[in-house]
Amino acid sequence: MKKIVLVSCVSKKNRGTHKAKDLYASPLFRKAYEYAESLNPDMIFILSAKYHLLDLEAIVEDYNKTLNTFSAADRKEWANVVLEQMSKVGINLEQDEIIFLAGKKYWQEIIASGKVKKYERPYLDNNLKGIGYILKFLNDALK
């Protein structure tokens, strides 16, 4: 069993072309990524509204897109692409542990598919509502 961490994209991005891990500029993404690394996972990916499952080293251009504006049908289609990509990169959806460092719109349809069997949602599991509470959780966990 592998441990996989999925960190959601954020709206604040550096302009231009960057490695995916360097594209996202917000304190929330930086802390979530730092926390993801602290978990010593086998793999970390970014859940991107535009690029779907994004490898940290992938070279990508900035964009302005969020799942928050997607219809339910579009989010379901997005999730199906993510699930397909997860399988292609060697993630075992039934056996590997998936940790979502993401809001509900980024994990809801992935989990609803029933394909991911072992998962954690630290933000939801700790009843964190709002960026301030999430940042506090991440900062406390990194102490």
Regions found by a protein language model. Give the residues of each.
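Peripheral peptide segments
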Residues: 1-143
